[in-house]
Regions:
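P-loop NTPase motor core
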Residues: 1-85
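Conserved P-loop NTPase
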Residues: 64, 70-113
Length: 113
């Protein structure tokens, strides 16, 4: 459902604009979550072109974009790999772009460097 929009990407962009307006109105941070497309599967280095749906509309409204990747699966590996890669692909706040490699502590839901 696209809520009256002719295309899904238009609806997603409108949602991102609305979220940004709420954040500005209340002077707070707004977290907008989205999934990546199949292009990102099994990749550690990600970019905003891998976002599902509205690649440019959602990105245009963001001040900071963090895309989270995990290591590709290893054949025969039974234990879940907790290594995660935080790709900062857009950063209007400090300007720094890059990847932070860390571990996911799933019991506490924290990323630890």
């Amino acid at each position: 459902r696209t809520g009256g929009f002719s295309r899904t990407d238009e609806a997603l962009k409108a949602n991102a604009i609305h979220a940004r307006q709420i954040a500005k109105q209340h002077g707070c941070a707004m977290f907008y979550m989205s999934q990546l497309s199949a292009d990102a599967e099994n990749k550690v280095v990600l970019n905003q072109a891998m976002m599902e749906g509205s690649r440019t509309g959602k990105a245009a409204e963001a001040d900071l974009m963090i895309l989270i990747a995990k290591n590709p699966p290893v054949e025969g590996q039974e234990e879940e790999d907790t290594m995660r890669h935080l790709n900062l692909v857009k950063n209007k706040l400090s300007g720094w772009h890059g990847i932070i490699h860390c571990n996911l502590e799933y019991k506490t839901a924290r990323y630890v460097v």
